[in-house]
Amino acid sequence: MRIIAGRWRGVPLAGVGKGDPGAHLRPTPDRVREALFSMLTSRGAIEGAHVLDLFAGTGALGFEALSRGADSVVFVENGRVGQRLITDNIAKLDASDQTRLLRCDATRCGPWSGAPFDLVFMDPPYGKGLGERALAAVRDWLAPGALVVWEENASMIPPEGFAPVDQRKFGTSHITLIARV
């Protein structure tokens, strides 16, 4: 797994190959990340953004956003393997001044006192309803109009307080783009 574009283009990230079912890690494939970031770039959603990466895993989506011009990323990951990989990648990219790792369950992180987030990546374990619960938990962390990129194994219906923006299917992955209203 590598950074696709931007200042860290081509830099390999610490990862788990095609995944680690025991650690519930399922990295988003390069071709899906390329298509996703093309969608976000065309909307002007990355440059200068404050990014929240929920169920961050390796942090690949957040690091890709930083590489392409986001101002900061907060990674939320409760698994030890994912936390170690994110910490390793922060060190590898010398990105500690632009990143923060919250070691908590994305559905129960409590209040946030920092800047509101403009862009959210959310790739929960498929089919467990965790995406809906995480959005409810962090809704007040988000700026009005914030974009949420939700990866699941089916198209998702936006919960109350969010509006649909776009949906795409890549193999077994469905990307649902919604905005906070």
Q: Each predicted region: which residue ranges?
A:
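Class I S-adenosyl-L-methionine-dependent methyltransferase catalytic core
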Residues: 1-181
